[in-house]
Amino acid sequence: MKKGKCVIFIIDGLGDRPNEKGLTPLKEAKTPTMDKIAKEGICGLMNAIDIGIRPGSDTAHLAILGYNPYEVYTGRGPLEAFGVGLDLKEGDIAFRCNFATVDENFVVLDRRAGRISPEEAEELEKEIDGLEIDGVKVIFKSSKGYRGALVLRGEGLSCRVSDGDPHEEGVKVSEIKPLDDSEEAKRTAEILNKLLKIVYEKLNNHPINEERRKKGLPPANIILPRGAGVVPKIEKFSEKYNMKGACICGTGLIKGMAKMIGLDVIEVEGATGTPKTNFMGKAKALVEALKEYDFVLVNVKGADEASHDGNYELKKEVLEKIDEMLAYVFEHINKDEVYFVLTGDHSTPIEMKDHSADPIPIVIWGKSVRVDDVTEFNEFACAKGALHWIKGEHVMKILLDLTGRNEKFGA
């Protein structure tokens, strides 16, 4: 049996709840290609992690790729650090960071330091990256201006520490505290508190910040770490599935997740992770990637952004653009060679402006699937499909079976 190639195409924040007319953006959107895929595939509903669990995009993607998020997800920090291109090692402690503005009493005046430019951030980065405190190496990389990632590398560290970011302005930078009684957590908290003071001393009168003050702009004179996580021991995708895999996405969080499990990240110009992303660029990149890779993960983020803004019409427009994107893809792939999963990672209902535990429609398309009677791709039609109701952990198992890659259990 020839082993087929696999695509998991995730529309971030796909699912929704019905409005007063009983409609969702997906049900109301004109999506002829998605409907055709549903008509030619096997449909159902999926909860990425489990029924009743509101997943983050990171934990949902891990689950769909067959990784137990309760075992390998330690926090957002490592994913952000991988996402900005840092080369992390097992045991590193990683954090998300903002450049921020504080006064001489460490009261936060601006959590984003007036949204400093990437060029300014790169200069300030040099003052932090490479520091050493109590035998622990400090690694820092800025990303998209005021954002960045911080990594501590050394012995006797723990991710069980609180945030330095108070998450509001007009209050002091939070003293970082251990979240358990371990010596490792106490040591890590002490190192971080020392680091923040050193960073302030190095950045406060830096030429970049002196120039910003002259222009009436807030100085970027501290970093605020949050979301601590330890880089886990994790089986790489190629070892786990014996497939060469890639990822196409625009958002740093998903890029970081992909890099953590060893997927090659394919960069697409104009792929922004927003409703204004380069949809067709991603579609063409997917078609090209299938010439080289056995497996491709695609994430398209725009619908989720629209949901978080509570913008029903924009979500509908994004879904229609994704449908055009899929039309191009399906003109260029062979049903005898590719198994295609179309789904989301979670629901983001317009009414909530946040993730919910509502299940997501899913369809699996390919030559050997048992086609059911579903003719539309939406939350209601897919509920009647022969795939019924599955969890994210089942997706890769189904693909491995369809492509002849799984092992028989028993005689």
Swiss-Prot record:
Question: What Enzyme Commission number(s) does the record list for this chain?
Answer: 5.4.2.12
The effect of pH on activity is described as: Optimum pH is 8.0.
Q: Which InterPro entries match?
A: Alkaline_phosphatase_core_sf, ApgAM_prokaryotes, Metalloenzyme, Pglycerate_mutase_ApgM, Pglycerate_mutase_ApgM_sf
Q: Answer whether the UniProt record assigns the keyword Isomerase to this protein.
A: yes
**Could you tell me the keywords of this UniProt record?**
Glycolysis, Isomerase, Magnesium
Q: In which pathway does it act?
A: Carbohydrate degradation; glycolysis; pyruvate from D-glyceraldehyde 3-phosphate: step 3/5
Per its record, what are the GO molecular function terms? metal ion binding; phosphoglycerate mutase activity
Q: Gene3D superfamilies per the record? A: Alkaline Phosphatase, subunit A, Metalloenzyme domain
Q: Which GO terms describe its biological process?
A: glycolytic process
**Entry's Pfam families?**
Metalloenzyme, PhosphMutase
Catalytic activity, as annotated: (2R)-2-phosphoglycerate = (2R)-3-phosphoglycerate
Q: Which cofactor does it need?
A: Mg(2+)
Q: Among its keywords, does the record have Isomerase?
A: yes
Q: What does the record say about activity regulation? A: Inhibited to approximately 20% by EDTA.
Free-text function comment from the UniProt entry: Catalyzes the interconversion of 2-phosphoglycerate and 3-phosphoglycerate.
Quaternary state and partners of this protein? Homotetramer.
Give the family, as the similarity comment puts it: Belongs to the BPG-independent phosphoglycerate mutase family. A-PGAM subfamily.
- HAMAP family in the record, alphabetically? ApgM_A
Q: What is this protein called?
A: 2,3-bisphosphoglycerate-independent phosphoglycerate mutase 1
Please tell me the species this chain comes from.
Methanocaldococcus jannaschii (strain ATCC 43067 / DSM 2661 / JAL-1 / JCM 10045 / NBRC 100440)
